Amino acid sequence: MGGDPAGATALGRYREDFDALPEGSLTVLNVVNTRRPMAGTPEKLIHLMEGMERHSRQKVTGFVNNTNLARMANADDLRDGYEVVREASERSGVPVLYTTGRPDLLEQFLAEGHDPKFIGAPMPIQTYMHRDWETFTREGL
């Protein structure tokens, strides 16, 4: 789940359905972008996660470090996000299951030798969202 407690409330409606699943079969991911003000520190991230858990009535089972600034992202974003998510993971006991990023940035970040325990599975992604019309008309999708 991502977003905030208000957005997580919609998941709470499905609690009975989730409770009917075999124990351990539901994975609830907290997709984290530490460049967003509400998740920029370990304290803020844990507070946000606890609010989402309360409103969704589900426990987060893993973090996804998705720290980015869209097309302006660089390896520093992944590195900074790693530090925040690592500390939040250590404090909360919630494991880091994935780290996402553009392939070039992810490769650079992984080459730095960070603790794999707080990276999880690397997941290369492409950015398709355009922040402005000019970029879209110049570059297309």
Residue spans of the language-model regions?
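Conserved nucleotide-sensing/catalytic segment adjacent to the nucleotide-binding pocket
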Residues: 1
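C-terminal accessory extensions appended to soluble enzyme cores
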Residues: 118-141
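Conserved catalytic-core segment of NTP-binding enzymes
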Residues: 4-119, 132
